[in-house]
């Protein structure tokens, strides 16, 4: 499920520490458990499926935010929404993730990045990264 993968990547990129992604995630390269996890990179596929690559690049840019670089972390659930907050000083970045459609998953901040979220409505697996000062 491509939408679930992109939401999982948002959690990985917002989580403290190095973002643990493997080569091939950006295309996404199929694989299984060891030893099937070491498939050869499909370089032809790198030119296609830009949705995951573009989202990973945008998430990598957000990792430069001071709240992610220096801030603490807090996890909680609000209704059916998983929330990951990173705060430093007066800046807070909040990742709101939903796997259900129809909900307004945004809380109150300025939207920096979203996926499957339009007109204040989540559509299936979706997320919003918002900033508060």
Q: Predicted regions span which residues?
A:
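Carbohydrate-interacting/catalytic domains
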Residues: 2-9, 14-21, 25-133
